[in-house]
A protein has these predicted regions:
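Polytopic alpha-helical membrane proteins, predominantly small-molecule transporters/carriers
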Residues: 1-343
């Protein structure tokens, strides 16, 4: 029962994340770089900080979390910086490959490598931990089934694109470049997977038994998002300078509206990793699901993103065959969340 509760919590977080771009559509008169970094203040700084504070028991301070973990803190933040690069390059993969192919390659790489790289790199730096033992047959099978589900959804996306007219195709992917797009999508997926590697290096940054299991991942989450914030801030402030958009922050007439929706978008985005931490607190009896939790989150992100696509009629006009392939992909991803536990 606890495992079902844990998976449900992770699913709720994934649903919230898939909804985070809805509030962004309500932002007025700000450039991308301006609203992106402001929502990032909430998503990557404020909310993760308060989340990390939940791991601090009474009588202890926030900074005590990091005592004796200097190397782990540095590595966790480093992989957060690299994850930030993944977020920025993700959009480029869709520019050169289209949404279906770009998302499939990038998210598939993120889910797969994000799950596997953590134990591999931990084994290099801390061989005494025997981290590779967590990569069991069930874990590898879960990753493979997740990749299969994402690939099937990618096929559905390609079928949808094939049904468009030539003019619509050019409008959809006017800069199509497979070699360049493939390289960028693989880079985006690899870098995005660094989030889970950062969590692996920060796995011990808490107060042991004094921190409830459901909060133990939150300090590491804060360090990863802090690293990602640094990457995004550098890029966004560069774009503010390049595009002369610093004046966005001085538009007092839209500040209230934009701050509200940036905060909402940031809260919805952070919900996925807050939910991941809470959910893992209920999965402690299943080492397989603990290892696969990030992969499960990515799979459910894809599921709910496509469910939103159906609700918002993004698949309107597609053939029944295309919709059938899409639904099969969604079902495979849902199965991937439970299959390892059944073996």
């Amino acid at each position: 029962m606890e495992i079902l509760i844990g998976l449900l919590i992770i699913a709720i977080g994934a649903f919230c994340q898939s909804s985070c771009y809805v509030p962004i559509n309500k932002i007025k008169d700000w450039s991308w770089e301006s609203y992106w970094i402001v929502q990032g203040v909430f998503a990557w700084l404020i909310l993760p900080f308060f989340g990390a504070m939940l791991a601090v028991p009474s009588g202890h301070s926030f900074f005590e979390l990091f005592d004796g973990y200097g190397f782990n803190v540095a590595m966790t933040m480093l992989f957060g910086v690299l994850w930030g690069v993944g977020g920025l390059t993700f959009g480029l993969s869709m520019r050169y490959l289209g949404v279906a192919l770009g998302q499939s390659i990038a998210l598939g790489t993120c889910a797969g490598l994000g799950t596997i790289m953590g134990p591999v790199l931990l084994n290099i730096f801390f061989p005494e931990m025997d981290a590779l033992s967590s990569l069991t047959f069930s874990v590898i099978l879960g990753v493979v089934v997740t990749l299969l589900g994402i690939a099937i959804i990618g096929v559905a996306g390609s079928m949808k694109a094939a049904s468009l007219s030539e003019e619509e195709k050019k409008a959809a992917v006017k800069d199509f470049n497979f070699p360049k797009g493939l390289a960028i999508a693989l880079l985006a997926g690899f870098m995005s997977g660094c989030f889970n590697v950062g969590l692996a290096f920060g796995d011990d940054i808490h107060f042991g038994t004094l921190t409830p299991d459901m909060y133990k991942t939150l300090p590491a989450t804060f360090l990863v998002t802090l690293g990602g914030f640094i990457t995004n801030a550098i890029y966004c402030f560069y774009q503010n300078t390049k595009n002369h958009t610093w004046g966005d922050y001085q538009k007092q007439e839209v500040w209230g509206n934009n701050l509200l929706f940036c905060a909402l978008a940031g809260a919805l985005w952070y919900s996925q990793f807050f939910g991941l931490s809470l959910g893992k607190g209920f999965l402690t009896e299943s080492p397989t699901l603990m290892t696969l939790s990030f992969c499960i989150l990515m799979a459910l992100n894809v599921v709910f993103s496509n469910v939103w696509g159906i609700i918002l009629k993004e698949w309107k006009g597609c053939s029944k065959k295309t919709i059938t392939v899409l639904i099969i992909g969604i079902i495979v991803l849902i199965i991937s969340s439970f299959l390892p536990q059944l073996i």
